[in-house]
Swiss-Prot record:
InterPro entries: PLC-like_Pdiesterase_TIM-brl
Gene Ontology CC terms: extracellular region
Catalytic activity of the protein: an N-(acyl)-sphingosylphosphocholine = an N-(acyl)-sphingosyl-1,3-cyclic phosphate + choline; an N-(acyl)-sphingosylphosphoethanolamine = an N-(acyl)-sphingosyl-1,3-cyclic phosphate + ethanolamine; a 1-acyl-sn-glycero-3-phosphocholine = a 1-acyl-sn-glycero-2,3-cyclic phosphate + choline; a 1-acyl-sn-glycero-3-phosphoethanolamine = a 1-acyl-sn-glycero-2,3-cyclic phosphate + ethanolamine
Cofactor note: Binds 1 Mg(2+) ion per subunit.
Protein name: Dermonecrotic toxin SdSicTox-betaIIB1bxi
Keyword Membrane found: no
Organism phylogeny: Eukaryota, Metazoa, Ecdysozoa, Arthropoda, Chelicerata
Family named by the database record: Belongs to the arthropod phospholipase D family. Class II subfamily.
Cofactor: Mg(2+)
Gene Ontology BP annotations: killing of cells of another organism; lipid catabolic process
EC number of the protein: 4.6.1.-
Gene3D superfamilies in the record: Phosphatidylinositol (PI) phosphodiesterase
The UniProt record lists the keyword RNA-binding: no
């Protein structure tokens, strides 16, 4: 269960207390591709404040503590951090610079170049395939600085509802055949059909298809849509209301089929039910 738009530091505990075991936050860049703040901006989801924010490096310092065992702030349930990268607000020519910058800030403030025991997995949410140079830069940077092993903790996800074969082609260009999630969804204000979601799930379940390991639906607020997504077999949901998802998961239809992922589960492995 991914808590959606958790951009203020005080919201982290708020969403974890509602039952989320993953959080998504938005990263806003300046015109040169430097990550500045966690901030969504207007417009955003119905019934949500769009303007909450924090300085990105301060957010990382806090979330490092929340995901470090034995730290006073540690919350065991938080296993995945989804970085919603607002690359559509900057020139595609700056995507590589942005990837370098985000990777360096994670190296310095989250992983602390080997001195941190923070353990969450990282999911890079890329809005459009045209920004794929961000991924190349993000993977190059730890490698160039002697910390390539951190790339094992990082997954890729394209969030713009683009053609799945087009996404596969870009992953092929990048040489990525593992650690790939696929999102499908729309703002909670609008309805969305299931055609593309079903296609993504079908590809995930195709033997030998290495370009989708997990599929999640976003942003779900109505229990009926949560049930619909679970019946289709999604691996996760993003929601403004994690507590509602928890209630649905406890229903007789789902209680024996689904459980919340823990740190012992590998987010890059296909689940074989």
């Amino acid at each position: 269960i991914m808590g959606h738009m958790v951009n203020a530091i005080e919201q982290v505990d708020e969403f974890l207390n509602l039952g989320a075991n993953a959080i998504e936050f938005d990263i806003d860049f300046d015109k040169d591709g430097i990550a500045q703040i966690t901030h969504h901006g207007i417009p955003c989801d119905c019934g949500r404040k769009c303007t909450k924010k924090a300085i990105f490096t301060e957010y990382l310092d806090n979330i490092r503590q929340v995901t470090t065992p034995d730290d006073p702030k540690f919350r065991e349930q938080l296993v995945l951090l989804a970085l919603d990268l607002k690359l559509q607000r900057i020139s595609s020519a700056k995507a590589y610079r942005a990837g370098e910058d985000v990777a360096k800030k994670l190296l310095d403030h989250y992983w602390q170049r080997g001195n941190s025991r923070a353990r969450a997995y990282i999911l890079l949410n890329i809005p459009l395939v045209e920004d794929y140079e961000f991924i190349r830069a993000f993977k190059d940077t730890p490698k160039n600085e002697g910390y390539e092993s951190y790339n094992d903790k990082v997954g890729i996800n394209f969030t713009g509802n683009e053609d799945l074969d087009k996404i596969r082609d870009v992953l092929e260009i990048l040489g990525i055949h593992k650690q790939v999630w696929q999102a499908d969804g729309i703002t909670s204000c609008l309805a969305r059909g299931t055609e593309r979601l079903k296609e993504a799930l079908e590809k995930r379940d195709t033997p030998g298809y290495n370009y989708i390991n997990k599929v999640y639906a976003w942003t779900l607020v109505r229990k009926s849509i949560m049930r619909r997504s679970l019946r289709l077999g999604v691996d996760g949901v993003m929601s403004n209301n994690p507590d509602r998802v928890i209630k649905v998961l406890k229903e007789k239809e789902f209680a024996d089929k689904f459980r919340l992922a823990t740190y012992n589960d590998n987010p890059w492995e296909k689940f074989r039910g």
